Amino acid sequence: VNALKTLSAVGIASIFLLAACGNDSTEEDSAEAGGDINYSEEVDYTITGIEPGAGVTETANNTLDTYDNLDGWELEESSTVGMLAQLADAISNEDPIIVTGWIPHHKFLQYDLKMLEDPEGTMGESESAHTITRLGLEEDMPDAYKLLDAFNWELDDVEQVMYEAEDSDVETAASNWVEDNPDKVDEWTENIEEADGEKIEIGSMPWEAEQASAAVMEQVLTEYGYDVTVTEVDPAILFESIAGDSVDATVAPALPITQGHLYDRYEGEFVDLGPNLDGLQNGFVVPEYMDIDSIEDLEPKE
């Protein structure tokens, strides 16, 4: 009996020993797969960017110059299409990647992404898209003016239009959004009388979020009897056109930073109806599977 007890004790001890060894191995594997990854080295100390002339490109370069831990890093300038292709390829293989990004954008619906914290604030503070009109629009088209003044929506709304437009076109996506959101549209159009074919020109910019906002406004104004023209131009030309009364209104300008210099240049020559979309933000964006949360988590190139 004593011999059996001894054998049993030895067997149990062996089981615990084997289990402990197994746990050590599992923990090591987990560490190798998770927090011990040098993401800075994995992305070759490179931020994947977009066009050289874009505002986010300028702020990204400023960020590389500001953070000491980004010493030796480079911004790979490309195009928006090129950046999105590299992002899609990295995510399909669960590879690390850091890209210049902005909110709103349909990629946040398409993928699980996060924007890295920016303690120095070099990528810019959160902004809002504003509705501005030419002087005199309230007197000339009071109902259109009231509708423009009431226009307000959320990031999820504009990203939904942008996402759907990837597989169709922005006009179709905007029409579907208006049809699916009658309560919100009813808030904008409360006490608005239908027009009788009055012409109104909405200015926009050649980027997806701005196109989505303009397309939704075009859809609603058209349903209320206006003959709407949407014109896409460079931001500088847009502000000049509003100030010169050749464009009636826009829902596009990002303030106070991105188009702030144009706002200051023409201030007093237009009417600012205030924000229609809050939460616009530029930043460094990574997939959720990357175990970093801040720009300060990155390491300098040695």
Regions found by a protein language model. Name each.
Residues 45-46, 50, 54-59, 142-189, ...:
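Ligand-binding clefts/hinges and TM-proximal coupling segments of bilobed small-molecule sensing domains
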Residues 36-37, 41-49, 148, 196-209, ...:
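Short, well-ordered beta-strand elements
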